[in-house]
């Protein structure tokens, strides 16, 4: 009996107490991946909401441009019809205001930043942004003119842990607010819409 006790010593009470943490460690091992996956789902859902609102904003901006470009010059500081100067005209500001109103809920709660309204070529989806004075020919019996508008925003990734996984960090500092990306990652979201341009005139009382 003495030899058996020497070969198989009884565990001390302290050793039994040390083994009680095994269940907690196993819980952490199983819980953390599931919890991280849940956070990533929330972050992806928020980005999907931003995507939907951006698409809606692009459509509203295209519809506004189709009306504003051919509208009465008296309402836009005497600017010529069928013409729009990017970032330098009252007509462009009116189109941008329509986009900002559509994006207002996400702007007010800080989900999106740096809203940009660009006008690529009507025949080039995803094309580069055009600058300067743009001219648009009203549609006729042989040609359907179109206005293409793209809305570009930076979506803020707020969900902890998941924002580092879903939204990659950017180390390019080209803007004064780019340093915030180190603390709060951003994800670019873009959406385009195209709308026929009739060049219709409107009568006002």
Q: Positions of the model-derived regions?
A:
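Glycine-centered recognition micro-motifs in short, flexible terminal segments and loops
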Residues: 7-32
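Generic, low-specificity signal for short hydrophobic/alpha-helical stretches with a mild N-terminal bias
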Residues: 26, 36-39, 133, 175
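N-terminal alpha-helical signal peptides/signal-anchor transmembrane segments
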Residues: 44, 57-73
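C-terminal juxtamembrane segment of a hydrophobic transmembrane alpha-helix
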Residues: 28-48, 59
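Broad hydrophobic/π-residue packing in well-ordered secondary structure
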Residues: 26-27, 39, 49, 153-156, ...
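Short, conserved structural patches
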Residues: 1-9, 67-205
